């Protein structure tokens, strides 16, 4: 079953959930502000999406309001601490399919490509 990670009040997450419902893709939703992800999970996501910088939303208000030393983590440990403290920095939604493949973000075209077998 596909797992969609994000925030309950996020428009992109709502759109992704609606898309999956509309096309009958079985999924569960996890609000990662309420259910923090383990450091190992964060590292797995980072490795699959291509790095910490690609995993976060640098245009978010939260990112812009961080102090300069916080928005320049120098190690995996610092990144993991930052994202567990501010999970809203993670680009949403994070989509993990049955086979463990991780992707981020929502668009109709990317979901059609990813879940085309359901259509």
Annotated model-derived regions:
Residues 1-23, 27-32:
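Local sequence-structure signature of Cys/Sec-based thiol-disulfide redox active-site neighborhoods
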Residues 33-119:
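Thiol/selenol-based redox catalytic cores and closely related redox-interacting motifs
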